[in-house]
Design a protein with these regions (language model features):
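Active-site acidic catalytic loop and adjacent metal/ATP-binding pocket
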Residues: 1-28
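Secondary-structure junction/capping motif
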Residues: 4, 27, 69, 103-106
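Regulatory N- and C-terminal appendages and interdomain linkers associated
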Residues: 11-13, 71-128
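Active-site activation/catalytic loop segments of kinase-like enzymes and analogous catalytic loops
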Residues: 22-65, 81-103
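Intracellular signaling interfaces of 7-transmembrane GPCRs
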Residues: 64-72
């Protein structure tokens, strides 16, 4: 990802993320779902997802957010993962299909989104 900046010296942050591609007003979990569901290798997400969400919850509590449980965070993550299909469809519609790099990126994004959706059973959230 060209918007992931990795620190190379000891005084740098290990990772900085710059995201200006699709500015919108949304809950923070939407960004978490996008990062984990579409931009993280499937096997890494599967292995680290719950630990990262636990860390996210600790961070929220550290900065004064109260009343959240892991179960709430998990359910919110699943809902936001379902919603990120809207983002994937919007981005796909704006890419130039003749651009090889864009096509490869989109293929990875959809593959990862599909895997996350299946793993998290997000379609079970839809009314029947």
């Amino acid at each position: 990802m060209p918007n992931l900046l990795f620190g190379v010296e000891s005084h740098h942050h290990r990772l900085a993320i710059l995201d200006w591609q699709g500015p919108l007003i949304a809950k923070g979990m939407f960004d978490v779902a996008l990062l984990l569901g579409q931009n993280t290798k499937i096997e890494v997400r599967q292995k680290e997802e719950k630990q990262l969400l636990e860390r996210y919850l600790v961070g929220l509590k550290t900065y004064g957010v109260q009343g959240l449980t892991f179960d709430f965070i998990w359910d919110d993550y699943r809902r936001c993962t379902l919603y990120t299909w809207v983002y994937a469809a919007g981005v796909a519609g704006t890419l130039d299909p003749t651009n090889e790099a864009g096509r490869a990126w989109m293929g990875q994004m959809v593959s990862r989104q599909s895997s996350a959706s299946e793993d998290l059973k997000v379609f079970d959230l839809l009314p029947s």
